[in-house]
């Protein structure tokens, strides 16, 4: 895990032998940060892979998929543009997440597929009566103000796990979940 505030940060990870490593570091951008991650992954003494060629795909969690993304998608230029267009809806999340995706592209190149999972996609089947606010409709059209629902990856996991435990078909399950 990397926590960064401007250029100073903390890099924390668990080694292949279970040791917890934590150190203060300088990280000027997402690419430099991701290079630290890959160095830890491939460290000869404590890494979990011999080299980066063992990594066959990369997954990203992005907070806001808006009305554009209803499912997980493979990263391409159109997806990057879509995520960028949604930065105003999640300025603290989508911008840095987009930087992370681009950093992975720089480090791994175009041959390693990347997938994006959107927190809002779980809730994307809400009908308009559930996601519309009692505000002028033009605000919805102009500013995309509506209920999106967040933490969908957690809600999906909880509801699928409950369906498995009950056992009930997930597709026929109506279940309140809280976060």
PLM region descriptions:
Residues 1-69:
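N-terminal glycine/serine-rich phosphate-binding loop of ATP-dependent small-molecule kinases
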Residues 1-3, 172-179:
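Single conserved hydrophobic/aromatic residue that forms the stacking wall/gate
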Residues 18-21, 32, 77-80, 133-137:
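Short, low-complexity, polar/charged sequence segments that are solvent-exposed and flexible
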Residues 22-23, 82-87, 141-145:
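Short glycine/proline- and acidic residue-enriched helix-loop micro-motifs
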Residues 25-29, 33, 71-75, 89-96, ...:
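Catalytic cores of large soluble enzymes that bind and process phosphate-bearing ligands
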Residues 41, 47-93, 113-115, 121-130:
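Short beta-strand-loop/turn "lid" adjacent to the catalytic site in phosphate-handling enzymes
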Residues 94-173:
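Phosphate-binding/catalytic loop of phosphoryl-transfer enzymes
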């Amino acid at each position: 895990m990397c926590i960064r505030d401007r250029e100073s940060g903390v890099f924390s990870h668990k080694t292949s032998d279970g040791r917890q490593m934590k150190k203060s570091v300088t990280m000027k951008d997402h690419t430099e940060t991701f290079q630290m991650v890959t160095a830890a992954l491939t460290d000869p003494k404590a890494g979990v892979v011999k080299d980066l060629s063992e990594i066959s795909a990369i997954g990203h969690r992005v907070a806001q998929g808006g009305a554009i993304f209803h499912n997980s998608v493979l990263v391409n230029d159109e997806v990057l543009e879509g995520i960028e267009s949604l930065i105003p809806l999640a300025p603290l999340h989508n911008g840095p997440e987009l930087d992370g995706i681009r950093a992975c592209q720089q480090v791994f190149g175009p041959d390693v597929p990347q997938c994006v999972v959107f927190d809002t996609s779980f809730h994307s089947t809400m009908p308009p009566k559930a996601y519309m606010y009692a505000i002028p409709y033009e605000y919805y059209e102009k500013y995309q103000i509506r209920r999106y629902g967040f933490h969908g990856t957690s809600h999906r996991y909880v509801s699928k796990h409950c369906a498995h435990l009950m056992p009930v078909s997930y597709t026929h399950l109506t279940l309140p979940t809280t976060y």
